[in-house]
Structure formats: C-alpha cells, structure tokens
Amino acid sequence: MAMDRERIVDEALALLNEVGIDKLSTRKLAERLGVQQPALYWHFKNKSALLDAVNSAMLARYHTNRPQPGQDWVEFTYANARSIRSTLLAVRDGARLTAGTRPSTAEFADTEAVLQLYVDAGFSASEAFGIAISITRYVVGYVLEEQGERERDLLDSDADAQSDPMAEVAPYPLLSEALRSLVNLGTINTEQVFESGLTDMVEGMQVRLRGKM
C-alpha cells in the first residue's frame, strides 16, 4: 500500500489510541507502517508537525459542530463546547494532543464562521475571539483532568483505591459539604460539573453583551 500523508496520520491516530501520547514515537509509527523512520520526514519535518496533523485529523473526524445561518449564539456555544469535549474524549490523550499543537490553515474558515456568529450577536471581533479561545481552553483543561483521572485510576494501588475521600477532608467542613454530593457520583469530573462551569461562562458573556446594548 502506498504511503501518503493521510495514511501516516491515520496510523498515527490509531497508534495514539493504543499506546498514548507519551509512548507515541516516529520509530514505532515507522515500524507500524513497515518503513524506515527517515521515510516519515518526507511528509513531516518533525514529530511536532506530525502531531499537528493528527490533531487536525481528530477534529475533522469527530468535531462536526459548525455554526448554522441564523443560529443563536448561546445555543451554538453550548453545542460547540460539548462537541469539543466529546471529540477529545473520543481519542486517548486527546486533550494533551490538542493542548500541544497548532491549528492548521484548514481550520481558519471554521474559526472565521464562529467569530462571525458572535460579531453578528453584538460582540466585537476581539471579544468574539476571546470567547472562542476561553471556551476551547475551558474544555481542554476540563478534559485534561478527566483523562488524567482515568490514567491515575489505572495506576492506583488497591490500598489507594480503598481510601475514603470523605475521611480525608473531614477536618474541613466547607470542603466536606461541597464534595459530599460528588462522592456519590464517584468523581469530581462529571457531566454535571462540566455543564455548571460552562453555564457560568455563558451567563457571564450574556451579562457583557447586555452591557453593550
């Protein structure tokens, strides 16, 4: 089978899902493709360029949310954040991949459409860009914690797994009260907490917009 950029990226994404970002290497990728490692550099000048392409492929494959003509900006913001989160969760270490890569020029048209949606709603271009960046970074940071917790759970010893989180925070009444409801869910990284934080951000944006009118 001929080796081209698309095949390299597809195999790199598959390898990422198997071994994680820390163990993803051009050597392992070359072995997977049945080629010598230098052959990869005909297509990508270094590993960073390869990861940029893998990130773009991940977004193209899973992040299908796009602003629609006449769509309400609040509705879009919620849908977009949820789509980014599900995309990052669909790939092992997806958040770490996105956090360490640069957007490609192929993504600029989508970004322009997002900014136009916010500008049409009444935000300035710089405010619109700030919203887009803030939402993305909130989601990436949240998923970093989600995926990091999964990795920690795999590494925890039996003794650690059996520790009582409420007993550990018992000397701190406010912390105990705040965590009590989450203990029943088994984790602080829940859909409920994600949605609560997202709502706080969106409501803050709405307040800013009302102040401009």
Language model features with spans:
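Helix-turn-helix
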Residues: R7, E11, L15-A49, A53
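Short, Lys/Arg-enriched anionic-surface-contact patches
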Residues: M1-D4
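C-terminal peripheral helix-coil segments that are non-catalytic and often amphipathic
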Residues: G148-M213
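Amphipathic alpha-helical segments used for helix-helix packing
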Residues: N55, R85-A113, L144-G148, L175-R180
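Amphipathic alpha-helical interaction segments
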Residues: A49, A79, A113, G130-R137, ...
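Short, basic, alpha-helical segments at the C-terminal edge of helix-turn-helix-like DNA-binding modules
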Residues: A57-R61
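Hydrophobic alpha-helical bundle segments that form small-molecule/ligand-binding pockets
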Residues: D110-D164, M205-M213
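Hydrophobic alpha-helical connector segments
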Residues: T64-F108, A125-A128, A132-I135
